[in-house]
Amino acid sequence: MASTGLELLGMTLAVLGWLGTLVSCALPLWKVTAFIGNSIVVAQVVWEGLWMSCVVQSTGQMQCKVYDSLLALPQDLQAARALCVVALLLALLGLLVAITGAQCTTCVEDEGAKARIVLTAGVLLLLSGILVLIPVCWTAHAIIQDFYNPLVAEALKRELGASLYLGWAAAALLMLGGGLLCCTCPPSHFERPRGPRLGYSIPSRSGASGLDKRDYV
């Protein structure tokens, strides 16, 4: 029962992490306008995401534009797109595999096979969390580096957007859920079965020596 509860908790955290990753990748809030210097009061705020950029006017009107050309985008943005998509697909696959091998389902009858399936699902979720963490940390590092770079104009400096914080939380949930699924697998299922010990005994020579003695009597 304890392992079943851990499996359900791990899958719940993984689902929340997957949803958080989806929202983080979809929202154009990876980079936002930095309010520094004389730009505390501005007429518009710029939001930048993986798929589009938005401009919010002081009147509340917002205009968004999807990036037209993929090849014209920076390499870090292209890599972030690819990693997020792969992470979403990998996490979804991990969830489906986890449901197949969960203790509360009857898709697989063998307990050893169930344990191996759940372990595979946990590894997939851990990998997906790492794939989410890479573009989020990469983008945050680039934003901070440009923010403190005196050669970058203040109008071009950005701050960390809400999508980055959501991405960190989603990656943590995915890795925590995957770790719980890995912990639910008992090690006894993965030990190689040991056969009976093959021993041998040295035949006693007392009988033979006795016969020899009787022959000489």
Curated annotation (Swiss-Prot):
InterPro entries referenced in this protein's UniProt entry, alphabetically: Claudin, Claudin9, Claudin_CS, PMP22/EMP/MP20/Claudin
Major location (coarse): other
All ranges on the Extracellular side of the membrane: 34-81, 138-159
Keywords from the named record: Cell junction, Cell membrane, Membrane, Tight junction, Transmembrane, Transmembrane helix
The keyword rRNA-binding is assigned to this record: no
UniProt-recorded Gene Ontology molecular function terms: identical protein binding; structural molecule activity; virus receptor activity
Stated role: Plays a major role in tight junction-specific obliteration of the intercellular space, through calcium-independent cell-adhesion activity.
UniProt similarity note: Belongs to the claudin family.
Quaternary structure, from the entry: Interacts with CLDN1, CD81 and OCLN.
Protein name as catalogued: Claudin-9
